[in-house]
């Protein structure tokens, strides 16, 4: 998934950039780390996809940015890369509470990441390539393992005895 418009839409991209900048200044927008969705877009998401908290959509946009930065280049992101980026960002931000935070937003599996990505595609916020599918997000990892069993708990240091 990527946020860039194809070249043939270069002129509208400038107006989208201006609109995004204006939305940042607007009190009627929703934001998370630079990811912004204006109220009309968020309202459409709430109506069409009520199963996810509005913050989940912002988190997915932030995770897309996080994943692209980590890869070091702006390019198409696969479902697996996106799901892994979402996991890593959630662990980085929310630590041992990551699974609970995602659950509160309605995200309980990697497929939910895909559902949100494709909701954003449906509204024209993100674009997909021809071969992209919601199934690309199925079963990438188990939430219980990723957020609980394999959480990188810090091992306590042994007490030094005299």
Label every model-predicted segment.
Residues 8, 12-32:
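Short, Lys/Arg-enriched N-terminal segments with co-localized hydrophobic residues
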Residues 31-162:
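Non-transmembrane, aqueous-exposed alpha-helical and coiled segments at domain scale
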């Amino acid at each position: 998934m990527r946020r860039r418009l194809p070249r043939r839409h270069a002129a509208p991209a400038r107006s989208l950039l201006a609109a995004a900048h204006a939305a940042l200044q607007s009190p009627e927008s929703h934001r998370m780390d630079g990811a912004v969705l204006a109220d009309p877009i968020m309202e459409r998401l709430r109506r069409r996809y009520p199963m996810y908290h509005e913050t989940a959509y912002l988190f997915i946009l932030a995770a897309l940015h996080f994943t692209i930065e980590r890869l070091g280049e702006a390019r198409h992101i696969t479902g697996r890369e996106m799901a892994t980026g979402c996991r890593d960002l959630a662990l980085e931000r929310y630590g041992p509470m990551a699974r609970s935070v995602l659950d509160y937003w309605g995200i309980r599996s990697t497929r939910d990441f895909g559902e949100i990505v494709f909701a954003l595609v449906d509204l024209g916020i993100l674009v997909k390539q021809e071969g992209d599918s919601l199934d690309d997000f199925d079963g990438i990892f188990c939430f219980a393992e990723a957020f609980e069993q394999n959480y990188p708990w810090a091992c306590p240091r042994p007490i030094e005895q005299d």
